[in-house]
Amino acid sequence: MKTAILTLSTLALLSTTTFAETKPNIPAKEASQIFKAAGFSKTKHGWEGSCDTGEITTYKDLNGDSLKDAVISDYSTMCYGNTGVGYHIVAQQKTGNWKLIFENMGIPTFLKTKGKDGWPDIENGGPGFCFAVYRWNGQQYKVHRYEYQGKACTLN
């Protein structure tokens, strides 16, 4: 019993310190534009979307066009079921404006494979064992294939 408690305590400590992700440093004006492009509104609790308060979890160039892109995550089992998370991908345009290009429920994993214009394929993770992989076709992200741990699978 003592070993189990010690192990759990150690894991809790490691997950909150060593492996903690740092939030991206985004200028306030830029963050405001990103949230607004995704349809979020500023409230006293933060930036709220149709489900819950969101946070920018990724802020970098995702497709190699030298412009920043952002991923906003929000969390709600009421909206997103067992997965509990949704995401919104916002891309900076050449004009400097931001545009929502994709949103979905699930946990996005950006893969090395790419669609049109250098946009990475997105594995849409969550509970289960076979996940949709979305590919950018120049207009939108659409389901391209299904895979689990890098191998093809089917939903049958």
Question: What is each PLM-predicted segment?
Answer:
Residues T18-K60, T154-N156:
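Terminal domain-start segments
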Residues Y80-V85, P127:
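Short, solvent-exposed loop/turn segments at conserved positions within beta-propeller repeat blades
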Residues A4-L14:
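Sec-dependent N-terminal signal peptides
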Residues D52-G64, G106-D121:
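Beta-propeller blade termini
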Residues W47-E48, T77-N82:
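Short consensus segments that form the blades of beta-propeller domains
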Residues A4-I5, A20-Q33, F110-N156:
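Acidic, small-residue rich beta-repeat scaffolds with periodic aromatic anchors
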Residues L62-Y75, I89, K116-G125:
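Acidic/hydrophobic-patterned starts of short beta strands in beta-sheet-rich repeat architectures
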Residues V85-A91:
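Short, surface-exposed beta-strand/strand-loop-strand elements in extracellular ectodomains
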